[in-house]
Amino acid sequence: MIKLVLVRHGESLWNLENRFTGWTDVDLSENGLKEARRAGKILKKNGFVFDVAYTSVLKRAIRTLWIILYEMDLAWIPVFKSWRLNERHYGALQGLNKAETAKKYGEEQVHKWRRFVNVKPPELTKEDTRYPGNEYKYKDLNEEQIPLTENLADTERRVLEEWRGNIAKDLKEGKRVIISAHGNTLRALVKYLDDIPADNVANLNIPTGIPLVYELDEKLKPITHYYLSDKE
């Protein structure tokens, strides 16, 4: 049996402020730091060990992973960072307060932007200061790879490129893997692993800082999955 652990980053400063974050590189809140430490301690308490780790290129996920591995005395294992594990890009909504956006556009429209698989928020322009192409960390991406906005299907597409190209190979080689990523990238991966129909994804939620364990067969098909909490 193969075990895979998924962790959504601890609460970020913009989670706390109820803002759309996307590719904006905000840090963890104080509570988020506590969530990351707690996740590391829970994993260690339950006997988990990892050979390799994956995360995005956004500091809230990277820092969460660092803290988890530190708490587990595993700071030395290889860590691979990929933009393909970044949060879904929220386009022109990035930085906006979710409640205020709902008042402006209506709760139904915002719900569709956030939760429907094939609905995209309004695009950024390349002249916008929030455009990822302005950031050094994305200098090696071509223009087609840098989103102006995304829906969940777009996010799933790039997440699965990372899954098939690297993560799945490590798992099949017997490596024990942890992924520290984001709400929508993990929703996309869970949708794929559990073969969830697009119509049922709207209510799928991944909480911050709580390890989600998948037990997989040799073909990487889920046998079961469960969250690790303080009570276990």
Curated annotation (Swiss-Prot):
What family is this?
Belongs to the phosphoglycerate mutase family. BPG-dependent PGAM subfamily.
Which residues are annotated as active site? H9, E87
Provide the function of this protein: Catalyzes the interconversion of 2-phosphoglycerate and 3-phosphoglycerate.
A molecular function GO annotation:
phosphoglycerate mutase activity
Top-rank taxon of the source lineage equals Bacteria
What name does the UniProt record give this protein? 2,3-bisphosphoglycerate-dependent phosphoglycerate mutase
Give me the residues that bind substrate, please: 8-15, 21-22, 60, 87-90, 98, 114-115, 183-184
Q: Which reaction does it catalyse?
A: (2R)-2-phosphoglycerate = (2R)-3-phosphoglycerate
A GO biological-process term: glycolytic process
Keyword terms of this UniProt record = Gluconeogenesis, Glycolysis, Isomerase
Q: What is the species of this protein?
A: Clostridium beijerinckii (strain ATCC 51743 / NCIMB 8052) (Clostridium acetobutylicum)
- Fetch the CDD domains from UniProt: HP_PGM_like (cd07067)
Which SUPFAM superfamilies does the protein's record reference? Phosphoglycerate mutase-like
Q: Which HAMAP family match?
A: PGAM_GpmA
Presence of the UniProt keyword Isomerase in the record = yes
Q: Which Pfam families match?
A: His_Phos_1 (PF00300)
Q: Gene3D superfamilies from the xrefs?
A: Phosphoglycerate mutase-like
> What EC designation does it have?
5.4.2.11
What pathway, per the record? Carbohydrate degradation; glycolysis; pyruvate from D-glyceraldehyde 3-phosphate: step 3/5
For the site Transition state stabilizer, which positions are given? H182
